[in-house]
Amino acid sequence: MSIRKCFLWQISCVVSIQLITTVQPLAAQTASESERLQKLERAVELLQKQNAELKAEVNSLKSKETASVPDGKFKTKVTYDGKTYVEKAVVEEKKVPVYVQQAGSEIKLVLGGFIQTNFEDGNVSAFEGRFGQTALKDRFRLRRARIGMTGDFAQNFDFKIEGDFEQNDGTSPSSRVDFSGTDIWLNWHQFPEAQIKLGQYKAPFGLEQLTPDTTLLIIERSNTTGAITPDRQIGVELWGKPFTNIWPEQKDLLTYYGGIFNGNGRNINNNDNNNFMYVGRLELMPFKGKIFGQESFLKLGGDVLNSRDDAGTNISQSGNLLVNSDGSLSSFVLPGADERTAWGVDAWFELGPFDLIGEYLEEYVNGRTVNGVPPGFANFTTDGFQITSGYFLIPKKFQAAVQWQYLNPGQKGNDGIYSITGGLNYYIHGNDLKLMINYIHTWSDFRQANPEFGQDEFNEVIGRVQVMF
């Protein structure tokens, strides 16, 4: 018999004896009816008090008995004693939850990333001049697979560190998937009007280039952007919003950027020479509000760039600029020293579900003779534009987009490349989960003027799945 059962039996005996000893004297007495009732009431009160004390003791014993049984779920454990298998229920130990704690004193730490996977069919990347001797084959492509972390310190510093498991075509040292740094920077933001950012990130030049990869209306950026803008560089910049405190309602009215960079690309710590790339950008938002009850804005921008580069520097970081003998394009790696000067203007107008974006870029590439060594190429001017429009057929869900782009490399007569893109975007869960499909038709002026090199019009279909986390 268990301790609990023995104790309950003792309680029953005590209660029974007390009832007998209390009720019998009451029955033998000859007192008045009221006195007998009073005695019965006192006896009942006494019994209730004793019963409450006994219940308290029973509960105490129950809790002790329960505490002797380990916490957790039971699982079946099978043992073998040499003759038979024995099954026994044993307590499964609870697992300690996994957690991550930052080593520093950040007040904010966010881990995230995104994956973009492409299907590319037809004349793959013909809009980038990838035809003829630089043609690519139909493929599935891991376009971007990035993971990064951002943080914020109470001492007015924020930072970002991000890496990518894929590279743009032509920038990877091998044909395999690589991992390399993209954004790695630290920003001091105590004064919103004058912030200091240093590390590796996109130099502030070009609206389409500075638009995040995950929010583009067209799957790929125009080749004009890729060929002329400097993309990611290592350096430092001063930037800010001058009206943040003096005119908070119009803090986005003006934003300025001014930076100094090595000028020879990302993930390269050694500068190509003792000169730097100087980049500046101004953004003006003269209007932000409602038109016809729709959220709207107008943003204008302008860029300038100057850089003195040595031989071996790639001056088309994420696009193709060098005109080959058959009119196709490839990355422009300088055979000798140069000095580049570039500028651009852009505008973005949004009216509810409608977006209209336009940008023009121009660059002058002039050779320099260094230590008696000629540059090895003729001076040239390259320019181009892109105009992009988007409209939500179903608000926030289904969007149609179109883009017209043109690049004039300026190295051979009639070497321009035009492309028109039509696309559909389905936002399953905003930009976090998005499907995109584009059809691109491309014309080559050089191929049209020189039909002996083959076709001068090209078609491509690109599909993309995007997941952000």
Q: Residue locations for each model-derived region?
A:
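C-terminal segment of classical bacterial N-terminal signal peptides
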Residues: 17-26
